[in-house]
Every structure is written in structure tokens, then in C-alpha cells.
Amino acid sequence: HRPAMNPIVVIPARMAASDLSGRTLLLTGVTGFLGTAILEKLLRDVPGCTVLALIRPGRLGAERRLRQEVMASDAFGPLRDRLGAELDAAVGTRVVPLAGDLGRDGLGLSGTDLARLAGVDVIIHSAAEVAFDSALDVALRTNLEGPVRLLQTVRSTGAMPAVVQVSTAYVSG
């Protein structure tokens, strides 16, 4: 069952770190290269923001994947050197791992996590199928239906966030 393709177009104004301070951001693709870099940048340069990190739980669970796959990344080396144990405290208070999947209705979120989406001010969508030899149906499901499902789910909570869409290599002709 494919999600309805209602046109949802959001063009946010350019945002500076000060604009994002105190805001709640929903970040997808956080276990990927770019998503990890975005999370590090948010923690380093945007004080006071809260990041809801949508993570496919896999066999480890979302929280464990955040700690073992994302926070252990070399991308966090300089920030870890600067903050030491304070980084773990910052992650514990500012990053909320949400066990979810863009391929599932309601993103597969628990009722508690779905309710958290009502407070989202900004979505940064960096999850994508980026393999150049992916089957077309896999690429469409991830890169087209996933973002539509994401926006529909967030908007179903009453939130009307700004959206930053990170595109794949295939968007330009």
C-alpha cells in the first residue's frame, strides 16, 4: 500500500544556529554518513536544541544503535576530545532516539514516540537509498514514499514544521 501523494511543499527560510536553539528537530538518516555529521554539528553549534533521531531499531534497538554506531563514529572525535564525559550527558539530555522506520505506516512508532512528533519544529530528512544499483522499487520506496510517509505522519500530530530535504544523486537530470 503506497501512501497518498498529496503535494506537500515546505520551503524554510535560511536558518542560523540561533534560529534553531531551543527548537525540537527530527533527524532521519542519523546512522548514515551525512546524518551522523549533521547530528555532530547540531550538538556542537546549536545549544539548547533537542534532536529526535529516527532510527531503525534492527536487532540492537534504536538507543543502542545511537550509542554504538553513531556516537562511536570518528565524526564525534573532536567534540568528544573537547567535551569528554559531558558529551555523553549532552546526548542523554538532547538526543532522543525514536525506534521507527520510514517504510512503515505511522513510521512504526510507539504511541509515546508518535506523540513526541507533535512538538517538532524542523525536520531534517537525510535518510535515503544511495546505492547506485538499487532496484527501482527499493529506491522509490525509500526515496519517494519514505519522505511522503514521514511528512504525513508528522503532520497528523498537528505539527507544521519547516522541512530540510537532503537529496540523493538522482535528483538532477
Residue ranges and their predicted role:
Residues R2-V122, S126, L136, T157-M160:
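N-terminal Rossmann/SDR dinucleotide-binding element
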Residues A118, V122-A127, D133-R141, E145-G173:
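Conserved Rossmann-fold NAD(P)-dependent oxidoreductase catalytic core, especially the SDR/UDP-sugar
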